[in-house]
């Protein structure tokens, strides 16, 4: 019988694969994603699908904006995934495929995709906030919703959430927090850049 890995095990594996200092502004992201993926790796009713993969990539890319040295970004993502048993290549490919498809999705295509996702995920109904970001990214990439009002976009997110068996109130809250944190991160990076210029 295999021994269940602890969060300490995951962190140890992470630092072995990524033996670099993480700039302070990005440290919280790395730690939160590492812990989140560790918890998900032990959830029997969680399944890594394309919406989750898209959400994970979106969160990581948004919150590593401006990361230096830039050549460490891919290594950081790979280490966060690998130390928790997630295959970074599979996640990248799954995310890229969905985002690419979404750019030409019609409403019928979306419904077909959601129906297939539901069928594939039967018995796996665990919700992660990363799924919420995946839904938001999916809708944001669809031409159908590029010019709609925010209330109409929210209605679509509500419909998608319900079709996937998620509570819209949780999805809405997680998306709202995500947007707020992106803005805070952007402001923090602007302040850092300004301070560097004045030195």
Swiss-Prot record:
GO biological process: photosystem II assembly
Domain of life of the organism encoding this protein: Bacteria
Keyword entries, A-Z: Coiled coil
Pfam family membership, one: ThylakoidFormat
GO cellular component terms given for this protein: plasma membrane-derived thylakoid photosystem II
Coiled coil among keywords: yes
Coiled coil, from the record: 167-198
Family stated for the protein in its record: Belongs to the THF1 family.
Stated role: May be involved in photosynthetic membrane biogenesis.
Protein name: Protein Thf1
